[in-house]
C-alpha cells in the first residue's frame, strides 16, 4: 500500500493541534485524491487560506548590520605571514640572477668582474 492510499483511508492529515482545533468548526476534509483532482482542474481547495502577495516597487531598505569581513581579510594586519611568504616566492628574479641563468652568460663563462 502506498502512502497516498494510506492517507486516503485515514481521511487526510490531522492537524498537530488537534485538541485546539476541535473547539473551532472543522474545515472541509479532502482526501489526497480529491485534492489532486481539484488542483489539476484549477479549482479552489476548501479550507486553504488565499494569500494576496504583490510586489512593493519601493526602494530597498539599507542594512542595519555592519559588513562582516571576508575570511581572508584580517582586521589586525594588512598582510598575513602566508601572503608575505607567497609574495617572496613569486617575485621576478633580480638582474644578477637573470644574467647568471641566461644561456649567453653560461656559454661565455658568466659575467666578468673588472
From Swiss-Prot:
InterPro entries, alphabetized: KPWE_PEX14_dom, PEX39
Report the locations given in the UniProt record. Answer: Peroxisome
Top-level taxon in the UniProt lineage: Eukaryota
Q: Where is this region: Disordered?
A: 1-26, 53-114
* Listed Pfam families: KPWE_dom
The keyword Phosphoprotein belongs to this UniProt entry's keyword annotation: yes
Q: What positions are modified (Phosphoserine)?
A: 102
Q: Which UniProt keywords apply?
A: Peroxisome, Phosphoprotein
GO terms for cellular component: peroxisome
PANTHER family in alphabetical order? HYPOTHETICAL PROTEIN LOC681367, RIKEN CDNA 2310039H08 GENE
Instruction: Report the protein's function.
Output: May be a peroxin involved in the PTS2-mediated protein import pathway.
Q: What is this protein called?
A: Peroxisomal biogenesis factor 39
Instruction: Say which species the protein is native to.
Output: Mus musculus (Mouse)
Its gene name is Pex39
Amino acid at each position: 500500500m502506498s502512502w497516498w492510499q494510506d492517507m486516503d483511508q485515514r481521511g487526510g492529515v490531522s492537524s498537530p493541534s488537534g485538541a485546539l482545533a476541535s473547539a473551532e468548526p472543522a474545515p472541509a476534509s479532502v482526501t489526497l485524491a480529491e485534492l489532486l483532482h481539484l488542483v489539476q482542474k484549477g479549482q479552489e481547495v476548501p479550507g486553504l487560506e488565499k494569500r494576496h502577495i504583490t510586489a512593493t516597487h519601493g526602494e530597498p531598505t539599507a542594512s542595519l548590520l555592519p559588513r562582516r569581513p571576508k575570511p581572508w581579510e584580517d582586521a589586525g594586519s594588512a598582510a598575513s605571514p602566508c601572503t608575505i611568504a607567497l609574495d617572496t616566492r613569486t617575485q621576478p628574479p633580480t638582474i644578477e640572477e637573470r644574467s647568471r641563468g641566461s644561456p649567453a652568460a653560461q656559454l661565455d663563462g658568466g659575467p666578468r668582474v673588472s
